[in-house]
């Protein structure tokens, strides 16, 4: 198995480390902060209504909207991680010096990761704990507005449209959460040998192949393909549904455009190239919409077999032929 035991994490330490650098928070007085939180909540509700009408889904998005700072985001991550680990039903490691060391090392790594991610993350829809909650990371949103000169009303609605679209994807396809969970379990339950992993790495050039191969590798590839579609679909909806409401939507998309070519982790592991997921998923959705209109995209949420494969993400016409005939 990729994981034989539930990960040991000292969450108190992890969250303390993730909170380091609170002085980096945008300088807002109490009154401005209160207005910001209220505005983001109202904007998120409006975004849910706009996206729901655009996608023809009888819902206004996530049940709960939480506006958080970086500390609040760390707490949310803990809840999501613990829920996923519980659902994997992995046993706990025996207590002892080795587990103590592992617990603290994991806390340092996770705390640093949460801290780095929270400074970039604008929002997140939690589809996996059953809480049906949309998080908006207020300090990161404000920092982007100031750094790039974005119009706050436009940028906040655009971000909220993307995240509410994720909520509506799971409304349109109630089976999607279980489908993703099953693929994740197949990956974590992999029994591939190191030799199989090295052979797969040599064949694919993807470092992720060292961790999983065979059927689990196929599950990971399939999962990455679907996540690519979901991110692209959320970007497409934010752009097109937002166009009548966001005067600067074209400028926002240009500012967030991902250039071709892998960068960072993507150079050694295409499976974890998040920038490629946004870029390729958006290109797929644009082409399908050009060929079949918005109803053509909705077909992906009818049943699991309609979800695009990784190969189809790169060849939207192939997906249209398979699903629409």
Question: What would you call each of these model-derived segments?
Answer:
Residues 43-140:
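Auxiliary, metal-adjacent structural segments of Zn-dependent hydrolase domains
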């Amino acid at each position: 198995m990729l994981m034989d035991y539930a990960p040991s994490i000292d969450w108190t330490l992890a969250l303390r480390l993730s909170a380091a650098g609170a002085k980096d928070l945008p300088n807002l007085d109490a009154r401005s902060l209160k207005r910001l939180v209220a505005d983001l909540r109202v904007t998120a509700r409006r975004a849910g209504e706009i996206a729901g009408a655009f996608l023809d889904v009888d819902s206004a998005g996530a049940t709960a909207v939480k506006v958080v700072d970086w500390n609040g985001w760390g707490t949310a991550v803990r809840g999501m991680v613990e829920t996923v680990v519980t659902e994997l039903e992995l046993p706990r490691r025996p207590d002892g010096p080795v587990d103590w060391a592992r617990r603290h090392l994991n806390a340092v790594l996770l705390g640093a990761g949460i801290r780095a991610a929270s400074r970039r993350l604008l929002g997140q829809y939690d589809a996996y704990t059953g809480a049906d909650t949309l998080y908006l990371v207020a300090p990161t949103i404000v920092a982007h507005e100031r750094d790039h000169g974005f119009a706050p009303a436009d940028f906040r609605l655009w971000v909220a449209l993307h995240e509410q679209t994720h909520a509506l994807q799971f409304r349109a396809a109630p089976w999607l959460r279980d489908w993703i969970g099953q693929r994740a379990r197949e990956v974590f339950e992999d029994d591939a040998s190191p030799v199989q992993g090295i052979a797969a790495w040599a064949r694919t050039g993807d470092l992720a192949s060292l961790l999983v191969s065979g059927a689990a590798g196929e599950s990971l590839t399939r999962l990455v393909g679907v996540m690519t579609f979901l991110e692209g679909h959320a970007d497409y909806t934010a752009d097109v549904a937002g166009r009548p409401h966001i005067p600067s939507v074209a400028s926002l998309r240009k500012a967030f455009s991902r250039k071709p070519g892998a960068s960072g982790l993507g150079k050694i592991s295409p499976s974890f190239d998040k920038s490629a997921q946004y870029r390729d998923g958006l290109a797929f959705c644009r082409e399908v919409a050009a060929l079949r209109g918005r109803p053509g995209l909705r077909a992906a949420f009818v049943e699991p077999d309609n979800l695009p494969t990784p190969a189809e993400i790169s060849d939207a016409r192939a997906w249209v032929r398979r699903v629409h005939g």
